[in-house]
């Protein structure tokens, strides 16, 4: 026996093997051009955040999704002169969560930190200090 269940905007239909043996008489519903979740980008027309936007790269639905949503929402709705300056705690919580999942959220390494410091200026100053010490002796 088939039945249908509504979950939010989705309708889930459960069918039996017998239901599949007969041709479907289901009517397809045309896309709603006013659907607030369809192709509006990150910010919906009413100013809310579209958490389904592919531009978020799944960040809103991963293991740190709630922390991401809290930080991003705080930043989006921030009224501070330095936008988001009141969101430090939320971003810190998101960062702490992401550090627990390094495979899912790899940290970008800055090239400057990977490069060893240039040893030439230090060697040059040591050489001139040695020359000065030798000259004064």
Curated annotation (Swiss-Prot):
Underlying gene: CHCHD4
Protein source organism: Bos taurus
InterPro entries, sorted: CHCH, CHCHD4, Cys_alpha_HP_mot_SF
Motif window: Cx9C motif 2: 87-97
Pfam families, A to Z: CHCH
GO biological process, one term: protein import into mitochondrial intermembrane space
Name this protein carries in UniProt: Mitochondrial intermembrane space import and assembly protein 40
Domain CHCH span(s) in chain numbering: 61-105
PANTHER family: COILED-COIL-HELIX-COILED-COIL-HELIX DOMAIN CONTAINING 4 (PTHR21622:SF0)
Biased composition range(s): Low complexity: 120-137
GO molecular function, one term: protein-disulfide reductase activity
Residue positions of motif Cx9C motif 1: 64-74
